[in-house]
């Protein structure tokens, strides 16, 4: 599944699919947070995979899945050798931190991309945010709820596109569990992407299975508000 969706993402990025003759480099474990907290120092790191001696490349910031409770950064194989800069992000995990800190880490890493990606040949006007499962949830929240990036003086509308794969759009199940909410009780509060649907959001591609019925509500609300 993850291979198929990454292949689709590479198609969505358009125009660079056959850039196979380019040399690529990977820089690992760059810190994107100024926090001195030991857990933040451990987890708030990212890897940058980039084509050497190229400029103006599209950029994908990729968040891993794992229910917000596990997982580690990696560069999806199907995103490699496509002429893109790919930034794979680690973030702090529940239950060691609150969900607000997971979201703050996601925003901080995106802000880092806007500040630093040109050093690696990326175009800050072509930054796409993506991720699978929990990573898809973070993608949608950071792009739709503008307060997270505003903290870092970044307008979320500057994101070129949001491409969440199977990300929850109601409040995340791990967050609900931590707060004593029944797993089968759908909740839409300030930690639900659905709560933050807005007309002026970045372009949004929703890729999901047919069991995730709430995704259709996102599209319905986007159409109603004119997004």
Residue ranges and their predicted role:
Residues 1-22:
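Bacterial Sec-dependent N-terminal signal peptides
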Residues 20-54:
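N-terminal cap/lid segment of alpha/beta-hydrolase-fold proteins
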Residues 56-65:
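Short beta-strand element of the alpha/beta-hydrolase
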Residues 64-69, 210:
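Active-site glycine-rich loops that stabilize anionic/oxyanionic intermediates
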Residues 72-89:
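Short amphipathic alpha-helix adjacent to the substrate-entry channel of hydrolases
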Residues 97-118, 141:
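Alpha/beta-hydrolase active-site loop
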Residues 114-177, 188-189:
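Primarily recognizes the serine-hydrolase "nucleophile elbow" in alpha/beta-hydrolase
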Residues 153-161, 167-173, 185-221:
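The feature captures the conserved acid-bearing segment of alpha/beta-hydrolase catalytic domains
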């Amino acid at each position: 599944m993850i291979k198929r969706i990454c292949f689709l993402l590479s198609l969505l990025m358009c125009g660079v699919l056959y850039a196979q003759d380019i040399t690529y480099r990977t820089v690992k474990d760059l810190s994107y947070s100024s926090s001195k907290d030991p857990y933040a120092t451990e987890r708030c790191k990212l890897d940058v995979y980039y084509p050497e001696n190229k400029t103006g490349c599209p950029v994908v910031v990729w968040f891993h899945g794992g229910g917000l409770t596990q997982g580690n950064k990696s560069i999806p194989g199907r995103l490699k050798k496509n002429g893109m800069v790919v930034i794979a992000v680690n973030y702090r995990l529940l239950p060691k931190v609150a969900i607000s800190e997971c979201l703050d880490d996601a925003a901080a890493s995106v802000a880092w991309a806007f500040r630093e990606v040109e050093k690696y040949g990326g175009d800050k006007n072509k930054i796409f945010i993506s991720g699978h499962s929990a990573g898809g949830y973070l993608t949608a929240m950071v792009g739709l709820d503008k307060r997270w990036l505003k903290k870092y003086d970044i307008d979320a509308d500057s994101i070129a596109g949001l491409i969440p794969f199977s990300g929850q759009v109601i409040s995340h199940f791990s967050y609900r569990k931590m707060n004593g909410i029944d797993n089968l009780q759908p909740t839409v509060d300030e930690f639900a992407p659905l709560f933050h649907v807005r007309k002026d959001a970045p372009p949004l591609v929703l890729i999901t299975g047919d069991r995730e019925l709430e995704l259709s509500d996102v599209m319905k609300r986007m159409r109603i508000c004119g997004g």
